[in-house]
Amino acid sequence: MALIGSGLLAILLVLSRTPGIQDVFPLKDFFRAALVVHVDLSVAIWFMAFAAVIWSALGRDGFAWLGWSGFALAAAGTALMTVSPFLPGADPVLNNYIPVLQQKYFYASLWICAAGFGLAVLRALLTTWPKPFLGAPLQSGAFLGAVAAFLALAAFVWSWVVVPRIEEKIYFEVLFWGGGHTLQFQHALLMVVAWLWIADHLGRPSAAPPPGRPKAGQANDAEPRSGEHPSPPPSGRGPGGGLSVSARALSAMFWIAALPLLVVPAIYFTIPAGELPHMELFAKLMIWGHPYMAPLILVGLLAVWATRRMPPHAAKSAFIASFSLFAVGGVLAYMIQGVNVVIPAHYHGSTVGVTLAFMGLAYVLLPQLGFGEVDGRMARWQPYVYGGGQLIHILGLAWSGGYGVQRKVAGAEQALTTLPQKIGMGMMGLGGLIAVIGGIMFVLVCLKLMLPRKR
């Protein structure tokens, strides 16, 4: 639901910023409200929803009522958030991380979603604790992702309690600053979990669909039925089936990557939320904390390289595209100078890398849940269409940012006066539309497998 709603709003956002088209479709007034909900659906809701999928798949049985209650609340909140831009009083505030609409319906959707995801995080903390401690790397990554999510939710609540209500843009910037930075660790950890799971799946002989596999939408009696746990990779197996990386080493890498999370409560305990040093420390946490992910990223690179001789597979396409886009986003982070569209180019690269990893893992999990094998050219090409469109979109933004085009504006406010600016934003529009097509392809592939078919 979140991915579909985000994709539909993305079409309007792209049209409102594309030279030439922006004059035919004057959507400037709607742009900011659509941007708020697009960001929240595509990053906050979609990422948290798939995080819950990973936690459920890797967690032990028990506390099912927490999972189902969380799902119901999150689904209701997402539905309300999706329609909120079209309801009265949708006054947007374009703060970072979780932008908001100053509207009672949107506020209600945020609280409902937060309650739902809070229950999912609580269940994850109770069920994904790795056993053995250093022998189950994917469970370690999932558990540490849940720890990051818990700290982020706690940071949001803490800031909400202690930060005084001031000018709206500043208030919401401060409110979501600490928790928003913390969520980045959750997304990165779970992205690597998805990479390693995909790589292990591709390295198994069974990754290639065998003769006589079930047709799309037809369950295999040898596979778990819908509603059952999928089987995670054997904990001791190296990623990609061709790398000898021990389970203990991988688990240790996840714990090392999560070490910067210890700084989060320390910042809140020592410096009041909202003060400038508080915000500066979280900015430095990103600079000095993410390099702790380097060993895991290196394993991801080696795993991508190990897949080069494996047969075509939708999950393989997603893995390659995910790593590539995440790398582009990381490079662009070091090119940011000033407040321009290089900033969204950077975070689009990083977040699209996470999205593609989750798409690839969905292709791995669907057959294990009894929905049949993901096969066909559409499935294999979907990650490249989506990732390729996003790459064009990102490069267009980065190009335009180099010529001074500002972020979070649309229509005439962009002041596109030079040919290079127009070329860059034209690339942005073209790439965005291609990416939307890739997103639709993902939804179609999944629905083809999940919807019942007449026999």
What are these regions (language model features)?
Residues 11, 15-26, 31-128, 160-164, ...:
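Membrane-interface helix-loop-helix modules in multi-pass inner-membrane proteins
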Residues 245-335:
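Membrane-embedded translocation segments of transport machinery
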Residues 1-4, 62-75, 134-150, 246-258, ...:
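Interfacial and helix-entry/exit segments of alpha-helical transmembrane bundles
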